[in-house]
A protein has these predicted regions:
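Short hydrophobic/Thr-rich beta-strand motif most characteristic of the beta2 strand and flanking loop
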Residues: 27-35, 43
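Receiver (REC) domain active-site loop signature in two-component systems and cognate sites
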Residues: 58
Length: 125
């Protein structure tokens, strides 16, 4: 059974590209999209994702603030920040908020896909 991914990014082009990338992989399915942290919290509670991939810098509520709330509501769901702001300071703040991993948007999409796979582990056959 494919892992359910919630994709969160305020940039529609990036959000759609991420959704397409996950959809093309047999071991993932996109269970929802959101354009900010507040919307991510609402959609996560309805769609019950296996993993959340989220931007750091978004309007309304950023990825760090959303992660703090999501970790309280869904402590077992891995949260991955996919952001252009992937420096040491951002990574430290993200880890303190409960983020499982931080991947730079400048990395190839395969880096993100592999990170999600490693965090969640293999799918039982």
């Amino acid at each position: 059974m494919p892992r359910a991914v919630l994709v969160v990014d305020d940039n529609e082009f990036i959000r759609r590209a991420l959704c397409r990338s996950f959809t093309l992989e047999a071991d993932f399915r996109v269970c929802g999209e959101a354009e900010n942290g507040k919307e991510a919290i609402e959609k996560a509670q309805k769609s019950l994702p296996s993993v959340i991939v989220m931007d750091l810098s978004m309007p309304v509520m950023n990825g760090i603030d959303a992660a703090r709330v999501l970790k309280t509501l869904m402590p077992g769901v891995p949260l991955i920040i996919f952001s252009e702001y992937a420096d040491a300071s951002s990574e430290n703040e993200a880890r303190l908020a409960g983020i499982s991993a931080l991947v730079s948007k400048s990395a190839h999409i395969s880096v993100l896909l592999e990170k999600v796979r490693r965090l969640w582990g293999p799918i039982a056959a």
